């Protein structure tokens, strides 16, 4: 058969690029780990990791930095997927944050994110002595991520310097680091949100049910629809929980993540919705609207 008869879709090319990056990380680094946040991008990353090394089990563990404020359905889904795939999962919760009872209700989005996510991630990476952390960030998500390299260098304090990034020519990646330094690696850098959903549809990848529209109890707060996920969310004066058809485009800590009104209850519906929406998926992340808590400033401090 002539080679010209072979046809590769854009999803095939994205998949091949991501698998190449995953294999490169395993080959080049001493002790890599895959950051598993349980969202759609993490689900795609896990699928790619399994595919990259099949039929052998993945040679690297997964790491979930748990804030204790994730949606209940996320934790249920996480535990089920770990059992189904047989991957090794490490869960880290910042013990200092637990001792101080840090939470998004009392301390606000910025403090909660810094202590339970950023500091928690740095603790977990240091304890595991990981020199490469694979994440599911994409360049189309947010402007600071748009300028970040696939292999994103971090100094010994996990800090990112956006003005001092290494050149990446074609598909050649520089994995050299000094002791104590590390690299964050983003195999989905060139994917879009629509690409992710098309790939999930094609590969039949399981995702958290919260991505699909259903009647859910929500309160309208600060211009967002916040899911009443458990009894820890106190209602403010005048607030009333109401049942609306909503879904989530992005998942994080539930008091800091807004839902969107939608009837997209299937993958086909979600893909059709993606083709029409003019809004970013991060419109539902409360932390992005907090002064001084931009994505770039968080990444400079060690956020993934």
UniProtKB/Swiss-Prot annotation:
Pathway in which this enzyme or protein is active: Sulfur metabolism; hydrogen sulfide biosynthesis; sulfite from sulfate: step 1/3
Keyword entries, A-Z: ATP-binding, Nucleotide-binding, Nucleotidyltransferase, Transferase
GO molecular function, one term: sulfate adenylyltransferase (ATP) activity
CDD domains in the cross-refs: Sulfate_adenylyltransferase_2
Entries under InterPro entries matching the protein: PAPS_reduct_dom, Rossmann-like_a/b/a_fold, SO4_adenylTrfase_ssu, Sulfate_adenylyltrnsfr_sub2
Organism domain of life: Bacteria
Reaction(s) catalysed (UniProt annotation): sulfate + ATP + H(+) = adenosine 5'-phosphosulfate + diphosphate
GO biological process, one term: sulfate assimilation
Assigned EC number: 2.7.7.4
Enzyme class: transferase
Purpose: With CysN forms the ATP sulfurylase (ATPS) that catalyzes the adenylation of sulfate producing adenosine 5'-phosphosulfate (APS) and diphosphate, the first enzymatic step in sulfur assimilation pathway. APS synthesis involves the formation of a high-energy phosphoric-sulfuric acid anhydride bond driven by GTP hydrolysis by CysN coupled to ATP hydrolysis by CysD.
SUBUNIT field: Heterodimer composed of CysD, the smaller subunit, and CysNC.
Family: Belongs to the PAPS reductase family. CysD subfamily.
UniProt xrefs under PANTHER family: SULFATE ADENYLYLTRANSFERASE SUBUNIT 2
Name the UniProt record assigns to this protein: Sulfate adenylyltransferase subunit 2
Organism: Xylella fastidiosa (strain 9a5c)
Lineage: Bacteria, Pseudomonadati, Pseudomonadota, Gammaproteobacteria, Lysobacterales
